[in-house]
Every structure is written in C-alpha cells, then in structure tokens.
Amino acid sequence: VGRYGLLPETFQTNGVGDSFAADSVEYISYSIGLVDLLERDGIVAWAKVSAPLHVKLYSLSYAVLWRLSGYTTLGVEPLNLLYYLLILSLVFSLGREVFDRGTGILAAGITALWPSLLLHTTQLLRDPLFLTMFLIIILVCASWLTRNYSWQRGVLAGIAGGAASAIVWLVRSQMWEVLLCTALLATAFLIIRQFRERRFLAGNLIGSVLLCSIMAAAPVAGKAFNLYSYPAEQGVSANRAGNVPANGTTATADNRPATPALPTLPPGSPLPARVSFLRHKFISSYPGAGSNIDTDVEFHSLADILLYLPRALMIGLFAPFPNMWFARGVQTGLAGRLLSGFEMFLIYLIEALAAFALWRRKDRLPAWLLLLISLAGMLALGLVVANLAALYRMRYGFWLLLIVLGAEGLRQIFRQSSSTESV
C-alpha cells in the first residue's frame, strides 16, 4: 500500500502509518541507526547503546532482513507476526483458563479480526511487546485462582510473571502502578479463594508473593538501565539509503526534530503527585491535537483527582464518544474516525456481553478479577491520558480482557437460546 502510494495520506512509502502510528516514524530511524552501529562496532556496542527495548528488537529484525526488504515495515514483519500470534495464543489461553476452550477460541477469533489491532501490529510500536507481556502477567495471576501449584511450579510462575513485568517496566513504565495493583488484587483474590475452599495453597501463594516482590523492585532495577534517552553522541546514526519518509528526505537519528523538554518528577513522589504529573505531561505532549479531551483539567490536590474519578471512568470505558465518530480527524481523517467509531460500537456490545457473563457466572473469581483489572486500568488511563489517540492504543490490553468476558457472555446467550429451542 505504501510503496504504490495507494493511501498517501495514511502510509509513507516505507509502509509506516504516520497518520495513526506516528511513533513509528521516529522508531524506524532509531532502528536503522542501531543496525549501522551493530554492523560497524559489533554486538557489545549495540548492547551498550541507550535505546528502548522494543526498538532494539526491531533493529535485530532489520539487521537480518534489510537487504531483502529494505527499511520498510516488511523488515520487521516477522517480529510483529510473532507478537500477533503470541497475543492470540495468550488470549485463547486466558479464555480457556478462566472459562473453557470454546470461550478461548471465540475470544482469540474476535481479537484476530480486530481492525485497528491488525493495523498497529504492522508498525514499529511498543504496543505489541507490551500487550504480550501484559497478557502473560494476567494469565499467571488468573492461574492462581484456577490451579493448585506445587511450590516449584509456583516459583516458576512467579518468575515468569516477574520477568514479563520487568519487560513492561522497560517498555512502558507509566503502567507500573496499574500492574502492581493487578498483582496485589490477584493476591487478595487468592486469599479469598483459600478461605472459600478452606485450604492453604502454598505454591500459589509463593508465586504471588514472588511476583509482587519483583514488581515492587522493578523501579529500582530499572533506574540502573538508562533506556529512556537517545543520545546522539553515542554514534547512532541512521544514514541508510532506502529510508525515505513522505517528505522525500532521508530520516536520521541526528536530524530528527527535538522533543520539547518536559519537567521531571522528583524520585519518591506520592501517587497523587505522579498522577498529576503524568496528566500534565500528556496535555503538554499533544498541543493542539484534534483528539484531545478535557485538556483544561489539571490536578492540584487529591480532592481534584477524586472529583474527576467518575469522568475518568466514563472516558476510559466509552471514549471516543458517539459525537466524535463521524467528525473528520486531524491526522486520521474521516476514515480513521469511522473505524474508531465502529470499534467503539463493538466495545459497547462487548461491555454489555461481559456484564451478562458475570451475571451468569457470578461464582467465577477469575472472571471478576478480569473485570476489576479492566476497570482499574481504564480508570487510571482516563485520569492521566488527555489524548484519545494515545488512550485508544493504551487500552488494548484491558479491552482484550473484556473481549474474553464478552466472548463468554455471547456463548451464554447461544446456550440459553439453544436450550429454549430444545424445550
């Protein structure tokens, strides 16, 4: 599509969708620079350079394939395809773990055909890696409520979840509090399960304590890795032929536009200060964007945050609202808005189906865990993310949990209809 200029307002000639995945424009330049560094100075220099983990992984894919594919999205398609298949596999596993195999298959099928997820998993974004690790964590947490682990398997599950949480910290550290709350909530549900069944599940509890401990230590360990800056003096250049953005110039890591400096948050700041800082950061990062919402709202106290909670939950669950579905977007145009409107309509249906599933399966602790994680995540995002385009991508993980619940709700309706017809 990009090479033949079929949608020039949406895709560059290298396949990057700069209208809906603008980050890819920057990440492809960094990836090319890392390939140059790898070929020129070797693997040690490549490993030492400061760059985000997902960009380094994309650079490895390019290092193998750029001579065949050029620096286009095809060069990272094997890695993105792996992410996509892992996401589908994990959604299936989660549906099977919480409900049954049929629900897992239906949930994975819905996910496989989700239009914007398909589009985003063709780009150079952090989202596919984040979603994969996020689903691993959720699957580990859900398994505490469905399985009886030996202490050895409990340790392995805790380490697997902890490793995934460490990668999430490196890829999207803003989600750390949400993930820690997820692990603590799952631990609380595990305690409830033990009281209900009147037995002590040592292996499960060991795994949960281990995961929570690793998550709590992640910020301290993360500070030892300076992976959040891209210093030009380290010699990362992207002077490669074939990487031609839409403006016809060669993209390089050295000539990329400078990002405006934003204030930093002092270490050890309380949670309300962090929420206020993150919201201000999102507002400052998207000046004049057509999909901004409530940019006039800033938090100056805990009371401000508490008063905004209902609005934040509404934004997290339902935005973009129907009045935005048919308005032309600044970057994505009318087609992008229509697609997001179609998907939001489906999400409304899925949310209703999820509520029906919980009503029919109210005894399933893992199902309630998925719901509460989804609500907590979307509430947190509604609090701090004032740009709907960013919110849209960051909600995918929590949408996938709702899709699992919605798939079970749909199957419950089919079962009820079948039983009625048989009578």
Task: Annotate each predicted stretch with a short phrase.
Residues 312, 316-326, 337-364:
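Hydrophobic, aromatic-rich transmembrane alpha-helices
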